[in-house]
């Protein structure tokens, strides 16, 4: 019997690009909306508490991404496993994977919360966070990590919905939680005069709301992934498969963020004004990155479902459709962010702030070198998603480790040390994207050519048996 929710989005038939856009646009809107509400933290703090509080929140961003995205990357394993079992019409397998995902996310969330609470200050000190913002950054980070278990449960639940092609409801859930987050930001910062701690508490409360909504959806789900509280447990086989598929994605994210932590440390060497500028520009650029990154998830999900359903003729079309989707989404956003850079940067800091001019000037530098060529990053991620969707979990991680992370670290230790300028630091991003995207593309074409020949050769033998 077919899953009653399997037609949420038909990934196995019809034109590729429109279906990819149908999948990615709500997911992109979800991510951008989440960023919009996260940016509200930064904007409210910058406008009403000054550049020191802005820098304090911003100095934690790469560290938060390092730890949180490492574990969230494992949700890729949930997405691939559930999507492939949907394609194979394995009802029991979808149910077991879904229940295991909820249990695994809670366990990993508690582990990550403990790590964050214990090592927040030592990690910030290792990053050479300026002394005038260290205390506030530590407070923000510890409060943020209290909500991390809810973040993971939400992301694993959303991964189950994405496996069905449902990217609409996560958008609704984040809209609700995001509005609450923005209102609480204003209440805590303006009314209660709690700056850094206030925005952190607001974030945790909004995360709790998003978890409630996604779990409520899964408990009432009318498909194979319907959750029953009594069946939530770690199924050994499913947990191992999720970790085998998702752990490399998590480690890849960690490696990227380790290099970004080193970049943040290099940015810290220029002082609090440049840290604030980097924070504002980074928030602007994250909108483009997140929108493009939705294509990465589409590439994984579409490839996994079609591979499970033996629709091998569609895989190459998914590759080119994913690249086209990146261009359609990424180019306009990058252009808008670059052309209107000064105006967008001015949102994050009060004009009366003594550091206003320096923050705008340094933020524009980052916009030109990082945001303008962001499409390269989007293409790199889409190609990585194709390789991962083919079932190759570790290779994309190794390619990213070599092409992006190590290259960026070596760049900081050599060229940046010799020419200590923001321009020399930021140009390491587009160069690393070009190298890594080219390597992922070569891996995809070589792997798919061999895998397709093997699968098509095995298919007649299976039919005869």
What is each PLM-predicted segment?
Residues 1-24, 82-147, 191-247, 303-373, ...:
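Short alpha-helical transmembrane segments in multi-pass integral membrane proteins
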Residues 13, 17-36, 40, 63-70, ...:
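Residue-level signal for short hydrophobic patches within transmembrane helices
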Residues 22-41, 143, 177, 206-210, ...:
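Transmembrane helical elements of multi-pass membrane transporters/channels
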Residues 32, 36-55, 124-131, 187-194, ...:
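Helix-terminus/linker motif at the lipid-water interface of multi-pass membrane proteins
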Residues 49-62, 137, 141, 200, ...:
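Small-residue hotspots at the loop-to-helix junctions and early N-terminal turns
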Residues 54-114, 151-170, 277-341, 377-399:
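Small-residue-rich hydrophobic transmembrane alpha-helices
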Residues 66-69, 181-185, 211-215, 287-290, ...:
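Hydrophobic transmembrane alpha-helices of multi-pass small-molecule transporters
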């Amino acid at each position: 019997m077919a899953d009653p929710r399997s037609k949420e989005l038909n990934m196995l038939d019809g034109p590729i690009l429109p279906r990819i856009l149908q999948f990615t646009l709500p997911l992109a809107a979800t991510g951008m909306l989440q960023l919009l509400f996260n940016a509200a933290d930064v904007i409210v703090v910058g406008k009403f508490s000054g550049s020191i509080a802005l820098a304090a929140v911003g100095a934690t961003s790469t560290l938060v991404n390092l730890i949180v995205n490492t574990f969230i990357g494992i949700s890729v394993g949930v997405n691939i496993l559930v999507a492939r079992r949907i394609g194979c019409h394995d009802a029991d397998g979808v149910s077991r994977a879904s229940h295991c995902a909820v249990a695994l996310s809670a366990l990993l969330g508690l582990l990550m919360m403990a790590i964050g609470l214990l090592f927040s200050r030592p990690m910030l000190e290792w990053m050479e966070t300026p002394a005038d913002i260290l205390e506030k950054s530590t407070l923000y980070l510890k409060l943020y990590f209290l909500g991390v278990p809810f973040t993971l449960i939400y992301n694993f639940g959303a991964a189950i919905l994405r496996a069905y092609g449902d990217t609409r409801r996560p958008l609704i859930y984040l809209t609700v939680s995001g509005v609450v987050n923005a209102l609480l930001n204003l209440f805590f910062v303006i009314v209660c005069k709690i700056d850094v701690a206030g925005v952190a508490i607001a974030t945790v409360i909004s995360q709790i709301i998003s978890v409630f909504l996604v779990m409520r959806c899964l408990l009432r789900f009318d498909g194979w992934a319907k959750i029953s509280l009594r069946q939530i447990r770690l199924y050994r086989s499913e947990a191992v498969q999720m970790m085998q598929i998702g752990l490399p994605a998590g480690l890849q994210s960690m490696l990227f963020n380790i290099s970004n932590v080193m970049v943040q440390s290099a940015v810290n060497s220029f002082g609090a004004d440049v840290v604030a500028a980097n924070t504002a520009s980074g928030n602007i650029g994250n909108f483009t990155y997140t929108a493009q990154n939705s294509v990465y998830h589409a590439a994984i999900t579409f490839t996994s479902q079609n591979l499970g359903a033996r629709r091998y003729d569609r895989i190459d079309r998914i590759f080119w459709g994913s690249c086209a989707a990146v261009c359609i989404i990424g180019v306009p956003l990058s252009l808008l962010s670059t052309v209107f850079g000064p105006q967008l940067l001015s949102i994050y800091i009060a004009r009366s702030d003594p550091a206003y001019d320096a923050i705008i000037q340094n933020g524009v530098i980052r916009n030109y070198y990082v945001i303008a060529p962001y499409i390269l990053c989007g293409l790199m991620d889409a190609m990585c998603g194709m390789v991962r969707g083919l079932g190759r979990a570790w290779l994309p991680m190794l390619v990213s480790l070599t092409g992006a992370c190590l290259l960026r670290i070596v760049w900081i230790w050599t060229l940046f040390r010799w020419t200590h300028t923001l321009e020399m630091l930021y140009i390491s991003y587009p160069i690393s994207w070009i190298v890594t995207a080219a390597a992922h593309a070569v891996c995809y074409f070589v792997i798919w050519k061999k895998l397709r020949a093997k699968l098509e050769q095995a298919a007649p033998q299976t039919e005869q048996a």
